């Protein structure tokens, strides 16, 4: 029965990985027209608008009290607010390769947090497979080249804080999905992202005296296409898929699927953007896939029941 209930969760996790993996292509398109924080602001504006439409038409019913918002607020601040903010500021001082290596450790951080907070007890083989998937991602970024001399302590710290925010979100969301409806969690997360990133972007534009250019990127059809994908699919839909998956399987298992998006990004870059695909990409991808599958399968005879039961 449990395995049958978990099947949709794994489908959701795979779909989540594909959407996130492809999102990097649309981020590249959006960056040709707008600044990173403007992109974040616009994508969560689209996400919040898309989440509000079915509520206005009565297709989705929400029964959110002020107390519920206060309870969910810390979760929404961890992701998307803190995760994307630390990441965006961190990338100003760090290379994408350095950031990729640090954020590859998110499943390990999640495993540690989940062990203490949720009492999740992965087996030693699951721990080993998780480390293997992390090593696969790190191997790819290391082989691509990391400029150690230009590495910034400030940038590394900000990226680390971004990774910790994601790990804490995975852990907290696992518990919150047992208390609140997935639509409620997703809606409030979108609302917080909308408020936080628009505030940051407008303050930055206000300081630079460029508020009048805030919506200029929407003149470009390519930007509109990219921001709709990032807002509706990569923000709203993935938030729902992530919350759904975390309501069914352990946090450390879901976290491992983040690495699958790395493979999707590599394949999409190779097929669509004609980017090179070297042997170390393939070697790393094999390690990632073996690690993700292995971390989600218990190969030991005795299975310790996870601390957080699956939501029925």
From Swiss-Prot:
EamA domain boundaries: 18-142, 164-297
Bilayer-spanning residue ranges: 11-31, 46-66, 72-92, 98-118, 128-148, 155-171, 183-203, 221-241, 254-274, 277-297
Keywords linked to the UniProt accession: Cell membrane, Membrane, Repeat, Transmembrane, Transmembrane helix, Transport
Gene Ontology, cellular component aspect: plasma membrane
Topology term for the membrane: Multi-pass membrane protein
Gene3D superfamilies, per database record: 1.10.3730.20
Compartments it resides in: Cell membrane
Main location: membrane
Family: Belongs to the EamA transporter family.
Protein name: Uncharacterized transporter YcxC
Source organism: Bacillus subtilis (strain 168)
């Amino acid at each position: 029965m449990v395995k049958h209930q978990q099947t949709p969760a794994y489908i959701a996790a795979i779909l989540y990985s594909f959407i996130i993996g492809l999102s990097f292509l649309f981020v590249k398109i959006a960056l040709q027209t707008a600044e990173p924080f403007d992109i974040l602001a616009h994508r969560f504006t689209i996400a919040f608008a898309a989440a509000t439409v079915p509520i206005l038409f009565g297709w989705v019913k929400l029964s959110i009290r002020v107390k519920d918002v206060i309870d969910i607020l810390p979760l929404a601040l961890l992701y998307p607010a803190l995760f994307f903010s630390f990441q965006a500021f961190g990338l100003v001082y760090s290379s994408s390769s350095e950031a990729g290596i640090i954020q590859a450790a998110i499943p390990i951080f999640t495993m540690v947090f989940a062990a203490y907070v949720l009492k999740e007890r992965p087996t030693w083989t699951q721990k080993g497979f998780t480390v293997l998937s992390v090593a696969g991602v790190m191997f790819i970024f290391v082989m691509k080249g990391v400029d150690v001399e230009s590495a910034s302590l400030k940038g590394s710290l900000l990226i680390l804080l971004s990774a910790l925010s994601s790990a804490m979100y995975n852990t907290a969301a696992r518990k919150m999905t047992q208390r609140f409806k997935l639509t409620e969690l997703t809606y409030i997360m979108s609302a917080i992202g909308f408020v936080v990133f628009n505030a940051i972007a407008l303050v930055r534009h206000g300081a630079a005296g460029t508020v009048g250019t805030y919506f200029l990127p929407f003149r470009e059809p390519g930007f509109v296409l990219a921001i709709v994908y990032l807002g509706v699919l990569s923000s709203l839909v993935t938030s729902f898929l992530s919350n759904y998956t975390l309501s069914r399987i352990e946090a450390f298992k879901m976290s491992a699927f983040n690495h699958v998006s790395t493979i999707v990004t590599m394949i999409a870059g190779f097929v669509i953007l004609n980017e090179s695909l070297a042997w170390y990409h393939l070697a790393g991808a094999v390690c990632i896939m073996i690690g993700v599958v292995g971390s989600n399968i218990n190969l030991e005879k005795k299975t310790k029941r996870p601390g957080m039961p699956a939501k029925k």
